[in-house]
Design a protein with these regions (language model features):
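Short charge-dense sequence patches
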Residues: 22-30, 53-56
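Short, basic/aromatic recognition patches
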Residues: 2-27
Length: 96
């Protein structure tokens, strides 16, 4: 096992997840890994039931809407919903 290669691979997967975001200003992806297996992933976006518009224009600038959920929150919520534990897991995030 090559840790540097594994880290690079998980970051690439997080980048792919970021591409799923509808955000125009900043797309963020997240992967949660435990025992060398991906147990969850997510991206920033609007909550279920909202439109997929993550920004609003204020004074000519795109501003992230307050309802946007972080990629980490989405990944952890999916993990918990499916009954998994994040104890001992690593999280890879494309933006900090």
């Amino acid at each position: 096992m090559d840790i540097k290669k594994d880290n690079a691979m998980y970051m690439q997967i997080a980048q792919i997840a970021a591409g799923r975001s509808y955000a125009k200003r900043l797309q963020v992806g997240c992967v949660i890994v435990k025992n060398n297996s991906i147990i969850s992933f997510g991206w920033n976006g609007m909550p279920t039931g909202y439109d997929n518009c993550c920004e609003e224009e204020i004074d000519g600038k795109l501003v992230t809407r307050k309802e946007v959920q972080h990629a980490e929150l989405n990944a952890i919520a999916k993990l918990a919903y499916n009954g998994y534990s994040s104890h001992g897991a690593s999280i890879y995030i494309t933006h900090s």
